[in-house]
């Protein structure tokens, strides 16, 4: 009972900053509370989530913020998902390269070969917390996001987009609220690895299928269908 009370108190204090500023709580964190704090050596997935949060904000606000560096990332693990609470520094080229502190919350879910990334929050840290952690976005899927999603790869060789929305110009399909992207790319299975057995495996072509949806509240979700990840084209 005492441990349960400590956990409730801990999560209550985490919620006060919406999961972002928790480093002062980590020394007293109960062992049963699965929250990880990181301020260096971020992996590829953290960078992907940071870029995705900035991407949503740019398309919503009409800005062109660019990732400069990541300050910290808190990740909360549950039985069904991982929530990333990322504080980063973004550069604003339109303001002479000035730097702004940015926060984004991205949730990663994995359901039997279907992986989803959902952006619940994307904002400047100086902005007041919204009543709900959901914001609208008129977003496209930028090439920087594509390049990170299919790591490790050398290059994207072709892309196609399907949407049921009434879009006249082909390039406008990238901005459709609901669309399916088919990306063919060159995959290097031994990139960054030491040779084993008979040596390196040759590069091969693969296909990535990414579905983007936005509900009536503007919640941005990317769904990755990995069932075709090993399909050779």
Swiss-Prot record:
InterPro entries membership: MS5
Coiled-coil regions, chain positions: none
Domain of life: Eukaryota
Recorded family membership: Belongs to the UPF0725 (EMB2204) family.
Protein's name according to its UniProt entry: UPF0725 protein At4g17990
Lineage: Eukaryota, Viridiplantae, Streptophyta, Embryophyta, Tracheophyta
């Amino acid at each position: 009972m005492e441990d349960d009370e400590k956990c409730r108190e801990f999560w209550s204090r985490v919620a006060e900053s919406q999961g972002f500023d928790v480093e002062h709580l980590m020394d007293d964190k109960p062992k049963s509370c699965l929250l990880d704090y990181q301020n260096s050596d971020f992996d590829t997935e953290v960078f992907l989530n940071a870029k995705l949060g900035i991407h949503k904000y740019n398309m919503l606000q009409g800005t062109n913020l660019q990732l400069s560096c990541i300050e910290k990332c808190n990740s909360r693990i549950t039985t069904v998902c991982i929530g990333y609470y990322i504080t980063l520094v973004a550069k604003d080229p339109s303001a002479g390269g000035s730097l702004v502190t940015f926060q984004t919350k991205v949730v990663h879910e994995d359901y039997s070969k279907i992986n989803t990334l959902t952006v619940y929050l994307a904002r400047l840290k100086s902005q007041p917390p919204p009543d709900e952690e959901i914001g609208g976005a008129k977003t496209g899927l930028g090439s920087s996001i594509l390049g990170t999603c299919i790591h490790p790869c050398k290059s994207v060789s072709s892309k196609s987009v399907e949407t049921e929305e009434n879009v006249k110009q082909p390039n406008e399909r990238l901005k459709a609220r609901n669309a399916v992207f088919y990306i063919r790319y060159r995959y290097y299975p031994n990139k960054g690895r030491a040779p084993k057995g008979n040596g390196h495996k040759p590069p091969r072509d693969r296909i990535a299928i990414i579905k983007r949806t936005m509900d009536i509240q503007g919640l941005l979700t990317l769904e990755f269908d990995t069932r075709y990840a090993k399909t050779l084209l």
